[in-house]
Regions:
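Short acidic/histidine-rich active-site segments
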Residues: 94, 138-157
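Hydrophobic faces of well-ordered beta-strands that scaffold small-molecule active sites
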Residues: 41-43, 66-69, 91-93, 143-147
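A structural motif corresponding to the C-terminal end of an alpha-helix
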Residues: 28-39, 134-141, 171-174
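Catalytic core of soluble alpha/beta enzymes
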Residues: 51-53, 67, 72-104
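Mid-to-C-terminal alpha-helical segments outside catalytic/metal-binding sites
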Residues: 159-195
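Charged helix-capping and loop-helix junction motifs
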Residues: 23-27, 123-130, 159-164
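Active-site gating loops and adjacent loop-to-helix segments of metal-dependent hydrolytic enzymes
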Residues: 1-25, 88, 95, 102-118, ...
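Divalent metal-binding pocket/active-site signature
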Residues: 1-79
């Protein structure tokens, strides 16, 4: 998605093997998270098979707080999402997964040479209705909602959250369910008392 970044930086990235032994660097990261139970592990923007391996490794390292980034975008099946929820992991519900311009853009890096080309990649696009049905099927009690807005090419995070909450209400999520996903679950994830 970032051709120039990939050429310059990818060789330094910590790899997540989908099977077999892991690198010392990955083991060190997982152990650091395990040693600090107040910290949660975010799977990051990786593939579906890599997500499933991270979850397996999190259990192996006894990491109890994990947030699966963009499960809809990672093309995790609904069964994989439900399995992750049953295992006690949170799933991220993010507005950009269904409402965002997918044209090339600069946001993480201001230099044009680092332009995000992810909009050019073929991928399954989920509609708002599909996304809402997935949240309903897995269960709001397992989701942490956000927008990923606020970057240069998107509206503000506040505008995004307003859109997200309005859409949830339109799809008949209750105020209590919305509060669970926007306040209660995030508080649990970072170790605060439920709000």
């Amino acid at each position: 998605a970032y051709p120039e970044f990939a050429r310059e930086e990818l060789s330094r990235a910590v790899r997540i093997p989908t099977e077999g032994p892991i690198s010392d660097e990955l083991a060190e990261i997982l152990q650091m998270v395990a040693d600090h139970p107040d910290v949660y592990l975010n799977t990051g923007h990786v593939s579906g098979p890599e997500v499933m391996r991270i979850l397996e490794l999190a259990e192996e390292f006894k990491i109890h707080k994990v947030l699966i980034a963009h499960p809809a975008r990672q093309q995790l099946s609904i069964e994989q999402q439900k399995d992750a929820a049953r295992r006690g992991f949170f799933l991220e519900g993010c507005l950009v997964d269904w409402l965002y311009p997918h044209a090339p853009r600069t946001h993480y890096y201001v230099e044009k040479k680092y332009m995000d080309r992810s909009g050019d990649l073929p991928r399954m696009r989920r509609s708002a209705a599909q996304w809402m049905a997935d949240i309903r099927e897995v269960g709001p009690e397992y989701f942490v909602l956000g927008t990923d807005y606020g970057i240069r090419a998107a509206p503000s995070a506040v505008q995004g959250m307003r859109t997200l909450i309005t859409t949830l209400l339109d799809y008949e999520f209750t105020p209590d369910e919305i509060r669970t996903m926007t306040a209660h679950n995030p508080a649990r994830l970072i170790g605060l008392d439920p709000l």
